[in-house]
Every structure is written in structure tokens, then in C-alpha cells.
Amino acid sequence: MQTSPLLETLMEALRCLPGVGPKSAQRMAFQLLQRDRSGGMRLAQALTRAMSEIGHCADCRTFTEQDICTICANPRRQQNGQICVVESPADIHAIEQTGQFAGRYFVLMGHLSPMDGIGPGDIGLDRLEQRLEKESVTEVILATNPTVEGDATANYIAEMCGQYGVVASRIAHGVPVGGELEMVDGTTLSHSLAGRHVIKF
């Protein structure tokens, strides 16, 4: 079936989003054109502004339209002395929602992967090392993903922290709250057993 070249271009552009295949892209395009043209215009304007104006924080590398993001610019966060290392800006959002962390962050934008040619310089570890050297950092919390690459990245950073006398800790991994043991995979259960703690009364 022949369709408008502009419509084809729109559907192809929508497919750059994660999890969006040809059918989903078609539904989105038709929805915008049939029922929500004003929403489509707002989306186009927001995308144009975001793509041209959002960059990276000079300190932590998260997304921001300022030179320094609001978290890094917060004096109380600066005095905290803790840096939480994460793989992506989305991880910051997840941790912030817990309300349990009051320090600053460092975003790797990925993880070490020698097989893919991704080394320390590609994930900003030179910048992190500068922060360890110049700032009063008391602890680096390693919140990389619980994968082989995430663990390797955490170990590399922990070794780097040791050179500057900075404590490096790894977030706990294990059984999710409300989960049933029989449904948990063996690797996760192993981590849970290894990371057990004493119950104090």
C-alpha cells in the first residue's frame, strides 16, 4: 500500500525509540495525525528544544541545560562527601525517588566493555579521577548494574578509589521486596546469601 512520503518519514523516525517497531510506529503516527495534531506539534517543539539545548553537567555528566546540574550545584549535596556512580541518568532518577541519598552523582553513560572497545576514557573515568583528586570525597557508592560488565566497572573504580584513600562501597543486590524465593534466579539468590546481614535486637 502506497502512503504519503512524509508519513513514511514520520513512522521511520518514531522507530528510533526503544521498543517501537513498524506497527507501533504506525499507530503512533496515525494517532497524532488523526486525533492529536496539537499534541504532535508540542512533541515536535519539545524534541527540537531538548535536542539542541540539553547537554551534560560538567561535574557529573547527567543531562541538563545548565553548565552544572541542580544536584551538583546544591551546597548541602557538596558538603555530603559522597558520590554515587551510576551507568545512566535514568539511574539517578530511580535513586532520587527513594529519598535515601543526599550526595552527588557521577554518570558513566555506559560501562567498561573491552570486547566492544569501551575503555576507561570512554565512560569518563578520567573526569571521576580528577574529582577524587581535587574534591573532599569520603565515599564512592558504586551503583552500576549487577551484570558482568557492571561488576567489572565497579571493581575498576574501587581500585581507583583505593589510590586516593577513598572508601568504595557497592550497593546490595538480592531478593526483591515482596518476592518469593522459588521465583528468584540462582545468581540473585547467591548474591543475597553472600550479602546477608546480622539481625540486631
From Swiss-Prot:
It comes from Serratia proteamaculans (strain 568). Transmembrane segments: none annotated. One of its GO terms (biological process) is DNA repair. May play a role in DNA repair. It seems to be involved in an RecBC-independent recombinational process of DNA repair. It may act with RecF and RecO. InterPro entries: DNA_Rcmb_RecR, Rcmb_RecR, Rcmb_RecR_Znf, TOPRIM_dom, TOPRIM_RecR. One of its GO terms (molecular function) is zinc ion binding. Belongs to the RecR family. This is Recombination protein RecR. It holds the Pfam family RecR_ZnF. The gene is recR.
